[in-house]
Amino acid sequence: MKEGTKEEMEGKFSKAKGEIKESAGEMTGDIEMEAKGEAEKRKGEAQEKVGKIRKEFEK
């Protein structure tokens, strides 16, 4: 698997994981979990974008 594709997939996974944590934090009133989930989601979004850019350069 090419690096760009791998990076993009890992980013999507981190984004999804962060969204779940963020939602769980909202439902339980756990502000710390909500913040950590949002941070992980943002990191995943950035990683996904980096993967897409790498894929363009791998062509």
Curated annotation (Swiss-Prot):
Any Pfam family hit: CsbD
Family: Belongs to the UPF0337 (CsbD) family.
Domain of life: Archaea
InterPro entries noted in UniProt: CsbD (IPR008462), YjbJ_sf (IPR036629)
Transmembrane segments: none
Ranges where the record places region Disordered: 1-59
Name of the featured protein: UPF0337 protein MM_2677
Extent of Basic and acidic residues compositional bias: 1-24, 33-59
